[in-house]
Amino acid sequence: MEQRKVSVAAHYKLPWFLTSFARVLDFVSKGLATRFLWRIFCGPIKFKVPSREAEFYNKTEQEMIDAESVSKKIMLYQIPNDGRRILFVHGWNGRSSQFYRIIELLSDNGFDITAVDLPGHGRSIRSNTNLPEITDLVSELTKSRGPYDGIVCHSFGGVAALNSVRHGASCEKLVLISPGVYEIKPMFKTFVGLFGLDEE
């Protein structure tokens, strides 16, 4: 059976020193290498914010809060209005300001907006995180800051929002943008492959 060659886009290529260190660890101990890779896997990357998103920060009220469910500090953004209440949840390696066009349109039409930078993302305090933690955070926000008439979410944030609703969080509407249906094991195997290591 022919082995399929996987090409990695330039912006996903990892620094040589990181891949080299992972390979040395893998040679010494598979267990150590796995723990090292898992730690990196759960660590969001903070990308540079483009200038087009600057207006989002000018228009929102910002508050760093202590999220009890995850014991971490996270950044909340709000545009108070008298209309229906919407919560925005971004995807992995994302940030709230990526919703700037949708948020501007909705707030101009009277919607009350709340957006969250997930743990380790955007302007929240740098930290590792994972799906169960983000699910707990969305549930906490719906209880402590809600109720919300709708939750708008992207990719990984959609998976967390679906899980939180499944576990009792309430909202009238759930809007999923490019929802990911993730199984962690295949995702982690692909991630390990980026280091040039045996995915098994």
Enumerate the predicted regions with their spans.
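Active-site glycine-rich loops that stabilize anionic/oxyanionic intermediates
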Residues: 83, 91-94
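Conserved alpha/beta-hydrolase
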Residues: 96, 103-125
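Conserved alpha/beta-hydrolase fold motif
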Residues: 150-152, 174
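Gly/Ala-rich beta-loop-alpha elbow adjacent to hydrolase catalytic centers
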Residues: 152-161
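Hydrolase active-site cap/lid region
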Residues: 169-200
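Alpha/beta-hydrolase active-site loop
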Residues: 127-150
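Short beta-strand-to-loop junctions in surface cap/lid or active-site-entrance loops
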Residues: 74-84
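An N-terminal hydrophobic leader/cap segment in hydrolases
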Residues: 10-66
